[in-house]
Each structure stands twice: as structure tokens, then as C-alpha cells.
Amino acid sequence: MGSVVRDPALIRALVAVWRLPVVDLRVRRADADAWSGAYFGPARRGRLAQAVLELPAAEEHYLAGRPRQALRTNLRHARDLGVTSGRASTYEAWFEAASVILRARPDGHAVGREMDKPGPRQHVAYYVARDAHEAPLAFASVALFGQFAVLFTMLSHLDRHPRASWARYQLHTFLALDLGRSGARHLLAGSALRETAGNQYFQHLLGYRARNLRFEVAESGAP
């Protein structure tokens, strides 16, 4: 504690984090219990300085304005190359596509071991971006908690850049709109401070902002 007191820069950083806007999130007890052992579960998730995206319901609103210019450019590149994104109908179909990408990544084996089929009370949405020949370029998975969701997997094919990079932007835009149109209001993507510079830039272009989170667990039968 003494070293913190003697470091004015650290004190300013801590104060800035403490003063971030707070997002209140309500989660059902059944969902909180179903994900209690997961690193991103509401009961275990860090509350301070989290990357949060306010989910859009309309594409034209989400992509409007100068802050989204770079995102619009990346989406145009993906579209010109015939990249398409969609929601997988089953875990098995998604994992088959994801495995193609994982085999081309040095971290693929380790990541694949963490991508088990969800439990019966765990609600997950799966997404895949493909090139014009239907080859997988990027994949993502999102845990669903009603009015919010948690992005816990998103990777692209390392051997097919830059198209795989553009596909990642398209895939995220697709899933954000899909979730927003389904009634979810916020998408959480982990710490806003611990990500790599590349991921922080990716999140910035997509509209994520650092926010503090406050969870309320709603017991069964609560309105």
C-alpha cells in the first residue's frame, strides 16, 4: 500500500478507473449458477474497467458517423472479397468450422481443449465467417444472459490475412446486430486494460468502452 501512496501516476489511474460509468446488469439465478465455474461467469467476473459494447439494433445507426469510418472500410473490404457471416445452427457445425481455423494456429490445440459443448443450462450462440468458397475465416462464441451477453471466444485464421482480419470485423458486426435485435443490450468482452494493443484497437473501432459493472442476481420468481 505504501508504494501505491508514493506513486501519483498510479493513484490517478486508480481514481480514473473508479470514476468510470457504471453499467447495471441483472442476471437470473439459474444463469448465474449455470456459469458459476466459468472464468467469465457473473459471480467471478471482474467488476472494474471492463470492455462493454452497447449493442445496436439497427445497422445504419451502428455504422453511422466518423468514429465508425475505419470499421465501414474493413466491412467493405470483407464484402468485396465475398466474405459472409452467420450464426451456426448447432455446436457441432460450429466446432467443425472452428477446428479448421484452430489447426492453423499455434495456440489452436490449447484453445480447442477449452471449447467443450455447453451444459444443458448454459445458453450459447455460435458464429462463423467464411470466404467466397465457404472456407472458415473466423469464429466466435457468446454466452447469453438475457439482457447482456459475454464474448468468450473470437479467433481468425492466421494464414489467410488480411481477409481473415476483415472477416473478424464483419463477424463481430454481424453478431452484435444479431444480439441487439434479439433484445440484448450489452456485450462484455473482458478487461479493457489487460488486452493486447491489437485487441484494444479492435475493440475501439467496434465501439467498446471501459465501464465498471454492477451485477444483480435475480432469484427465481422475481419480476
Regions found by a protein language model. Name each.
Residues M1-A43, T90, G146-A210:
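Acyl-donor binding region in acyl/amide transferases
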Residues R28, E54-P56, G86:
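A structural detector for beta-sheet-dominated domains
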Residues F40, L63-A164, T173, D178-L179:
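A conserved beta-strand-loop-helix scaffold within acyl/acetyltransferase catalytic domains
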Residues F40-E60:
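Structured beta-strand-rich cores of soluble
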Residues Q50-A51, R209-A222:
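Conserved catalytic-core motifs of GNAT/GCN5-like acyltransferases
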Residues L55, S89, N212-R214:
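Residues at the C-termini of beta-strands that transition into short coil/loop
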Residues A93, R194, A218:
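Positions that flank functional sites
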Residues F95-E96, A197, G221:
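Short secondary-structure boundary/hinge segments and terminal tails
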